[in-house]
Curated annotation (Swiss-Prot):
This is Nucleotide-binding protein Smal_0950. One of its GO terms (molecular function) is ATP binding. ATP binds at G16, L17, S18, G19, S20, G21, K22, S23. Displays ATPase and GTPase activities. It comes from the Bacteria. InterPro entries: P-loop_NTPase, RapZ-like, RapZ-like_N, RapZ_C. PANTHER family: RNASE ADAPTER PROTEIN RAPZ. NCBIfam families: PRK05416.1. Belongs to the RapZ-like family. It comes from Stenotrophomonas maltophilia (strain R551-3). GTP binds at D69, V70, R71, G72. Keywords: ATP-binding, GTP-binding, Nucleotide-binding.
Length: 294
C-alpha cells in the first residue's frame, strides 16, 4: 500500500480475467460515486490521473476507478512503475485482480454468448483463457487483493466489494415514489406497483375535482376515509419490512409506483405520504415524481 495521506485522492485499478466480474466491480464503484473509466491503455494511466486532478477549483473527482484488460496491451509489466508515478503525485492507489476458474469462465461465456477479447487471435475459448492468464500475470503479482469469483453471483460479488472495501455510501438507497395514471400504462422502471383505484375517488367531489393529491383539501378528504387508513397501515408495514432488505448494497435505486385512474388524486396522495414516511424513518435519498403532472 502507498504512504499517501488519508485525504489523498483514491485510485482503484480493476484488472483480471475477462469474465471474472470486472465490469460488475466497476459498476459497483460507479454506483458509490467513483469516477470510472474502462479499458484504459495502461501507458495512459499517469496522464489520465494528472488530467483529472489538474483542476484546483474543487471539481476534480477524488475517487477514481479504472478498468484495465489485455486488449492492445504489450506493457502490462510496467504497471508497478506507473503506479509509483501516481503515488508520487499524491494519489492513494489500490490494485484489484479478479479471477475465476476455467470452468466458471467457460460457463459464463456460454451463458452470455459473448466473444472472448483474445478470440481475434484465432484461439479457441479454452486457449484464449489460458493465454489471458499468462498475459495478466504481471497484474496479478502487483495486486493488493486477488478476488476469486468462481462461486459468486453478481449480487454476491457486489456485496463482497462493498464490504471488503468499506465503500462510504454502501448503505445509501435512492427511493423514488412515483404516481401515474393506469390509462397511460404502468411505469416500466417501477420495482413495486400499488393500485389506488380501490380507494374512494375525490374526483367525484366537485370541490376537489380540480385539485391534486398534494393539496390540503384532497389530503383531508382521503385521510378521513377508513379504507384509506387501512390501506396506509398495510402499505407502510409492507414497505418498512422490505425496503431495508433492498438497502443492503445490492441495489442503488428503487422505484415505488402508485396508480389510479387519472394520476391526479389518490396516487399522488399516496406517493407524497409514503415519501414523507420514508424520510421520517431515516431514509436520506428520497424523491417524488408525478408522471401526469410534473
Amino acid at each position: 500500500m502507498s504512504t499517501a495521506p488519508p485525504s489523498a485522492p483514491t485510485l482503484i485499478i480493476v484488472s483480471g480475467l475477462s469474465g471474472s466480474g470486472k465490469s460488475v466491480a466497476l459498476k459497483t464503484f460507479e454506483d458509490q460515486d467513483y469516477y470510472c473509466s474502462d479499458n484504459l491503455p495502461i501507458n495512459l494511466l499517469p496522464d489520465f490521473v494528472r488530467s483529472l486532478l489538474a483542476n484546483h477549483d474543487g471539481s476534480a473527482p477524488r475517487r477514481l476507478a479504472v478498468g484495465i484488460d489485455v486488449r492492445g496491451q504489450s506493457n502490462l509489466s510496467q504497471l508497478g512503475n506507473w503506479r509509483q508515478l501516481a503515488t508520487d503525485a499524491g494519489v492513494e492507489v489500490e490494485v484489484l485482480f479478479f479471477e475465476a476458474s476455467d470452468e466458471a469462465v467457460l460457463k459464463r461465456y456460454a451463458d452470455t454468448r459473448r466473444r472472448h477479447p483474445l478470440s481475434q487471435l484465432g484461439l479457441s475459448l479454452p486457449e484464449a483463457i489460458a493465454r489471458e492468464r499468462e498475459l495478466t500475470a504481471p497484474l496479478r503479482r502487483e495486486a493488493d487483493a486477488v478476488i476469486d469469483t468462481s462461486t459468486l453471483n453478481v449480487h454476491q460479488l457486489r456485496r463482497r466489494i462493498i464490504t471488503e472495501f468499506a465503500l462510504d455510501h454502501a448503505t445509501r438507497l435512492s427511493l423514488l415514489f412515483e404516481s401515474f395514471a393506469y390509462k397511460r400504462g404502468v411505469p416500466a422502471e417501477a420495482d413495486f406497483v400499488f393500485d389506488a383505484r380501490v380507494l374512494p375517488n375525490p374526483h367525484w367531489d366537485p370541490d376537489l375535482r380540480a385539485l391534486s393529491g398534494r393539496e390540503p383539501g384532497v389530503r383531508d378528504y382521503l385521510e378521513a376515509q377508513p379504507d384509506v387508513q387501512h390501506y396506509l397501515a398495510q402499505l407502510t408495514d409492507f414497505l418498512d419490512t422490505w425496503l431495508p432488505k433492498l438497502g443492503d448494497g445490492t441495489r442503488s435505486y428503487v422505484t415505488v409506483a402508485f396508480g389510479c385512474t387519472g394520476g391526479k388524486h389518490r396516487s399522488v396522495f399516496l406517493a407524497e405520504r409514503m415519501a414523507r414516511h420514508a424520510r421520517e424513518m431515516g431514509w436520506e435519498d428520497v424523491a417524488t415524481y408525478h408522471r401526469e403532472q410534473d
